Curated annotation (Swiss-Prot):
Source taxonomy: Archaea, Methanobacteriati, Methanobacteriota, Stenosarchaea group, Halobacteria
TM spans (from-to): none
Region ranges (Disordered): 58-85
Feature: compositional bias, Basic and acidic residues: 58-70
CDD domains attached to this UniProt entry: GIY-YIG_UPF0213
Domain GIY-YIG: 3-78
Signal peptide: none
Stored Pfam families: GIY-YIG
Name of the featured protein: UPF0213 protein NP_0776A
Top-level taxon in the UniProt lineage: Archaea
InterPro entries registered for this protein in UniProt: GIY-YIG_endonuc (IPR000305), GIY-YIG_endonuc_sf (IPR035901), UPF0213_domain (IPR050190)
Family: Belongs to the UPF0213 family.
Amino acid sequence: MAADHYVYVLSCADETLYTGYTTNVERRVAEHDAGEGAKYTRGRTPVELVHTERFDSKSAAMQREHEIKSLSRAKKERLVADETG
């Protein structure tokens, strides 16, 4: 059975947004909160999961991660708002 692949966006304590890739969102968010995630999120805890997208392949997820990381902050905020509102 193939694993699901996810792209996620976190809202950090300093109000910045972090985008990442994982196969287990719950575990990865916990790692970020524990200071064991990406260097970027260390010292910016606690983090809040504000957006996720699921993909069937790692390549599709990684491509989407790159797309989101390339967005302006305003466009990232709209992406998050579309999911929450």
